[in-house]
Each structure stands twice: as C-alpha cells, then as structure tokens.
From Swiss-Prot:
Family, similarity comment: Belongs to the V-ATPase H subunit family.
Role noted for this protein: Subunit of the V1 complex of vacuolar(H+)-ATPase (V-ATPase), a multisubunit enzyme composed of a peripheral complex (V1) that hydrolyzes ATP and a membrane integral complex (V0) that translocates protons. V-ATPase is responsible for acidifying and maintaining the pH of intracellular compartments and in some cell types, is targeted to the plasma membrane, where it is responsible for acidifying the extracellular environment. Subunit H is essential for V-ATPase activity, but not for the assembly of the complex.
InterPro entries per the UniProt record, alphabetical: ARM-like, ARM-type_fold, ATPase_V1-cplx_hsu, ATPase_V1-cplx_hsu_C, ATPase_V1-cplx_hsu_C_sf
Subunit and partners: V-ATPase is a heteromultimeric enzyme made up of two complexes: the ATP-hydrolytic V1 complex and the proton translocation V0 complex. The V1 complex consists of three catalytic AB heterodimers that form a heterohexamer, three peripheral stalks each consisting of EG heterodimers, one central rotor including subunits D and F, and the regulatory subunits C and H. The proton translocation complex V0 consists of the proton transport subunit a, a ring of proteolipid subunits c9c'', rotary subunit d, subunits e and f, and the accessory subunits vah-19/Ac45 and vah-20/PRR.
Disulfide bonds: none
Species of the source: Caenorhabditis elegans
Pfam families, per database record: V-ATPase_H_C (PF11698), V-ATPase_H_N (PF03224)
Annotated protein name in UniProt: Probable V-type proton ATPase subunit H 1
Cellular component terms per the entry's GO annotation: vacuolar proton-transporting V-type ATPase, V1 domain
Molecular function GO terms recorded: proton-transporting ATPase activity, rotational mechanism
SUPFAM superfamilies assigned: ARM repeat
UniProtKB keywords: Hydrogen ion transport, Ion transport, Transport
Length: 451
C-alpha cells in the first residue's frame, strides 16, 4: 500500500490489522498433538482466551505465574506460522496495554533465567512480516518505559537501529505511525535519546518527514514531536546541528498553517539553543536558524493571532535571541575587513537578510570602493570559495539595492559573472548562475524568495 493524501490510512492501518488478528480462530490442540507446544502451554493459552474481562485475565495470570510467560515465549518461538505468532504478540500487547504493571511477569522470569526480559522478543525484529516487527516495537516500548528494567547495551542499540530502519522506509512502511508512536514514548528517557542520535537517527527522521509530506499534518507533527523530545538532551541538540534538521523544519515553518505543527517546530528550535550548554554550539544553532531565514518567518507569523501562550512565548524568545546574534555577528565592520583581506568565506553576514537589507547601500560608499573589490575578485581570484561568496554577495547587492543592477554592469560585473558560468567548479557555476539571474531579470523578486 502506498500512501496518498488520506492521512487516515497511515493512522489506522495497524489498528485495523490488529482487529483482524484478534478475530482469528485458533486451534492450539493441533500444536499440542504434534508436540510443538507443551500441555502446560495449551492449558494457559486456552484458559487465558476464555477470560472475559480484565479481572478474570489478571486472575489467570496470577494462577499460572511464570508458566504464563513460558507459554507466551513457546507460542512465539516454537510455532513457525506467522498468523499464530501475530496472534500471540497481539495478546501480549493487549495484556500490557490493559495493565502496564504486568511487564513485571516477564522481568521475574528473566531474572530466574539470568537473561534480559527484552531477549524474549528481540529476535522478532528481523522478521519479514512487518506487523510482527511493529507489534514487537509496541511491546518492547511498554516494557522499556513502564518496566523496572530498562533497555541497555546491545539490545538498546539493536532496537534503536530497527526503529531507524523503519523510518528510512518512509511511506513504503505501512506501519510508520506505529514506529513513530513508539519513539514518542521512548524518547522521554535520556539513554534512549542518546542511543538513537548516535546512530544518525536524525537523518532517518528528516527522511521520514520528507517522505510523509503529502500524508497530512498529523504524521508530520508526530515526527517533529520525536525531534523535539530528542533536543531536550544536550548531546542530541549538538548532534542535530551537524545535519539538516534546522533546514528541514524551517521549511515546514514557512509553509504550514496548522498551529500545533508550528508550535512544535518553534519549540524544537528553542530547545536547540537552550539545551546546548556550550556557547559556541549555541551560536552555531542560532547561525543556522538565521541562514534558514527563521527571523523572517517568525516576523510573518506575528501577524497571526495564536491562542497558545507557550507558542507566543517561544516565538518572542527566539526573535530576541536571534536578533542578539545578528547584531554581534553581522556587523559591517567585520564584513568590510573580510572583503579588504580578500578572504571571503561563508561567515554569517553573507546569508543574513537583515545584514543586506541594512547594509547593501554601503558598498557604494567612497565611490563604490567595496563593490569594486567584489567585482575584482570575480575577475582575478582563483579560489573557488572566494568566487562563490563574491558571486553570492553581488547577487544580494542587486537584490537589496534599487540601482544595484546598473552599478554592477557599469563595473563589468555582469561580464565577469557570465565567464564564471563556464568554469570547471560546479559550486562556482551554481552561485554564478543565481547571481546572473538576478542581474538579468528586471525584478529579482520574480525569482522567488528562496533564491
């Protein structure tokens, strides 16, 4: 099944499949006669199935005690038919959903056997049947969060790796919502957050976010919710800056109309600043937000009347913090010094809208001294990085200075830019092309705000 616009498909697929499993007619006697399961296993499962309510099921479990766990394990491991494994796992998941304190029965038996309670289920995560895999996620999540024994070591890494794989499949995974819901529960605990980010888990979440972009806002909200939970951990917040998380969720912030999605995106961005204890990493988080035009997007959102007090507070916090960074890191003196030394690099000023809006006209001071330096770099520099930044800056000058196009043409900048379109370096060609488009079009805004 491939998902389209109907978000209900991905929200209910697991539940619908579980309903089919619960309605299955079982014949446990067949497996007893062939000695695939013991008589004690048969006695328990039949008695448990006959229990009609929570109280009766609790009584059955208290009577059979450790025999109940042995029976569940034998039914999962000694019967090879997927439909019976599905049925057994569904019984266990329903049992734990009804009362999560029942996780202790697996823990008690595991202690007797000197093994982990999670080891009863770990082998099921590599099964081909995706219902089996995802209901196992559901069971392990309940045990790992509500039980007395927590996932750790190789078992934790294996579980997180399996969840990451589920995310990487995107909407090719009919059960993606189930996996996301498990992560929403697991990521409330620091060790689980750290384990996931240490295996590049963020990449799988951003992939899933892109993959589900046409599946409705609810699944997008849930995936970003997982990101938000991760960013409460300082290490996880730092790791997030090495990928494209900010770029991904900033795109959603600029396009989404749903308040709950906007709220979770803004809160995630705030966490990326507050959870990072290192001053340098805080600055890097702010820089990425500035480069992805978060200040501008927050300014646009101010026009909406949000009812959520926390959202408004988070927006004000971000605006305040980002303005501080802009003021410190995008001074024109810094930019001028960089330009005069001929050492152009991607410092914050180059991609900051506020900087260009306030300072583009200053390239004309002293008979266009600084603008001439930029054009000269296009003609004389052999450094691909310098050429990229110089081309970008000339494009921004044209974009923000009303007569910028004419000024650049008079200095020979247009011809120099066109020559860069034929150089070998693809990055230089890319930035030269963007700048050349701005030079040739009558109104640069026709190109769109994202250029």
């Amino acid at each position: 099944m491939v998902f389209g616009e109907n978000q209900d498909l991905i929200r209910t697929h697991f539940q619908k499949e579980a309903d089919k499993v619960r309605a299955m007619k079982t014949n446990w006697g067949l497996f007893t006669r062939t000695r695939m399961i013991a008589q004690s296993d048969y006695d328990f499962i039949v008695t448990y199935q006959q229990a009609e309510n929570e109280a009766e099921r609790s009584t059955v479990l208290s009577v059979f005690k450790e025999k109940a766990v042995y029976a569940f394990v034998h039914l999962m491991s000694q019967i090879s038919k997927d439909d019976y494994v599905r049925y057994t796992l569904t019984l266990i998941d329903d049992m734990l959903r009804e009362d999560v304190t029942r996780t202790i029965i697996f823990e008690d038996v595991a202690v007797l056997l000197k093994r982990s309670p999670f080891s009863f289920f770990m082998g099921l995560l590599h099964r081909q049947d995706q219902y089996i895999v995802h209901i196992t996620f559901s069971i392990l999540t309940k045990m790992a969060v509500f039980g007395n024994i927590k996932l750790s070591g190789d078992e934790l890494d294996y579980c997180m790796g399996s969840l990451k794989e589920a995310m990487n499949r995107g909407t090719n995974n009919d059960y993606i919502v189930t996996a996301v819901r498990c992560m929403q529960t697991l990521f409330r605990f620091d060790p689980y957050r750290v384990s996931f980010v240490n295996i590049n888990g963020y990449d799988s979440l951003t992939h899933a976010l892109y993959s589900t972009r046409k599946c409705g806002f609810q699944i997008q909200y849930q995936i970003i919710f997982c990101m938000w939970l991760l960013t409460f951990n300082g290490h996880a917040a730092e790791v997030a800056l090495s990928g494209n998380l900010i770029q991904t969720i900033s795109g959603i912030l600029g396009n989404c109309q749903k308040e709950k999605v906007i709220r979770i995106v803004v809160s995630t961005l705030r966490n990326l600043i507050t959870s990072n204890q290192d001053v340098y990493m805080k600055k890097q988080a702010a820089l990425q937000m500035i480069q992805n035009r978060i200040p501008t997007k927050l300014d646009h959102l101010e026009n909406r009347k949000f009812t959520d007090v926390d959202l408004v507070e988070d927006m004000v916090y971000l605006q305040t913090e980002l303005k501080k960074v802009v003021q410190v890191l995008t001074s024109f003196d810094e930019y001028e010094n960089e330009l005069r030394q001929g050492s152009l690099h991607w410092s914050p000023a180059h991609k900051c809208e506020v900087f260009w809006n306030e300072n583009a006209h200053r390239l004309n001071d002293n008979r266009q001294e600084l603008l001439k330096l930029l054009v000269a770099m296009l003609e004389k520099s052999n450094d691909p990085l310098v050429l990229c930044v110089a081309a970008h800056d000339i494009g921004e000058f044209v974009r923000y200075y009303p007569r910028g196009k004419l000024k650049v043409e008079q200095l020979g900048g247009k011809e120099a830019m066109m020559r860069l379109l034929t150089v070998k370096d693809p990055n230089v060609r890319y930035h030269a092309l963007l700048a050349a488009q701005k030079l040739m079009i009558n109104n640069w805004k026709d190109l769109g705000l994202e250029i």
